[in-house]
Amino acid sequence: TLTTKLHGGYVKSLEDRDRIFNEQLNKTGAEYFDYYLLHAIGRDMYENKYLKFDCFNWLREKKRLGLVKHIGFSFHDSAAVLDRILTEQPDMEFVQLQLNFLDWESEGVQSRLCYEVACKHGVPVIVMEPVKGGSLVNLPSEADAILRSLGDGSNASYAIRFAASFDNVCMVLSGMGSMEMVRDNISYMKDFKPLTPEEMGGVKRVADVFRSQNLISCTACNYCTERCPKNIPIPAYFAC
């Protein structure tokens, strides 16, 4: 499966859309992409980039031509904004959401609310940030003890299985930096079993520990460092 995206930050004219797309085809040597998404949509990006430059209709045309098999977008905003977009763009085939057990009830990320909006519109969800940039793997001792009491699964396994336990989730993206991580992911996803009620209760208790300790909710996506005028490695300081 081959997937890539159109980043609105690089689109400054109608011509940029095809230029970027053709460069992506040339660099990959592919004839088409299985999944193609409009990247990091929120209200501002939706209105000032993707609508302004007619990117949804452009993407539909790529699908009509057979250059893209499935079209959708990744999303970072409120459930209300997502509802508006899916109402205005009803033929989107997937939406990529930040979904993990820490952000599930977050007032800022609104994972649960956004998931419910996708369900309402019948749009499958692809999950990003299931381990929240590693935050749900490298746990505080109190939280780690909770997961250890559930069994011998890795911390990542509980986080990724949480994300994959919802009926409308069609795919979970997992950033893997070693063969050990690949093997670990395969071990519990090959013959997947959703979290049991006991395990679901355990990960919710882990989320409570995070909230009680006022830990900084950072995914280490580094978007902030790209915009920092002093080039401060902000996620690295948060991780200290």
Where do the model's predicted regions map?
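Glycine/proline-rich, positively charged
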Residues: 8-131, 138-144, 150-151, 163-165
